[in-house]
Amino acid sequence: MLLASILVLAAAAVAAVAAGGMLPGSAGRPCQAAFVPAFFSPAGWTRAVTGSNVPNTMILDITTSGAGSAPEPAFQAAVKKAQAAGVTVLGYANTSFGARPATAVEQDVRHYKAWYGVTSILLDQAATGAGKLGYYRRLAGFIRSVDPGAAVWLNPGLYPDQRYMAIASVVMAFEGPYSGYSRLRVPAWVSRYPAAKFAHTIYATPGSQLASAISLARSRHAGWVFVTDRSGANPYDGLPGFWPREQATVARGCHG
């Protein structure tokens, strides 16, 4: 699971649909958007929003669970800078697999809007079983009551009960090392949905396997993909060493 702040980046050339609709593609093929989960300080966002490939989306976390107890001026400035560059910012909220009180998550949603002007949310440590469907329906309904156009991302890290697809704009359906990704089995029902409803996070990827990982994600119907060579306790504490090449590879896969 993504344990703390997450930065999700999509190359500006790849116009993602905020509500999770089909990403534009060529010849009827689904397009991929590159996203980055990252434990970045506000200063660390500079590289991500600088250059020709401006991010499409960032997911913001202030603490290890959500918006925190007070606004952080440095993050407020970072959000404003990102939004001014055309970036959509989402707030991060930990759900502890459905064990965190819904009222606490809803308070995070209120704080993100009031303090940062952010209404779309990523619900991390999401449950996968049918027993928590009501919990996530409630949260998604609340998020969309705050802003009907808000995106709701769920991160269970694996494929959930299919009924979660009606709740989420995007489901992070894989989070793990490349060694495990090469053996991933995708449920047959996945092909019934737009690729833009699925995201895959692949870490500990050798540079020589970057193109392979992106190609595998495309073949597995993932419209959002993040690949990093980082590993260890926190593989998200910086951009991948091959980040410029990753952006270019994803863009070529989309438009080529």
Labelled PLM ranges:
Residues 8-9, 14-17:
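Hydrophobic alpha-helical segments of integral membrane proteins
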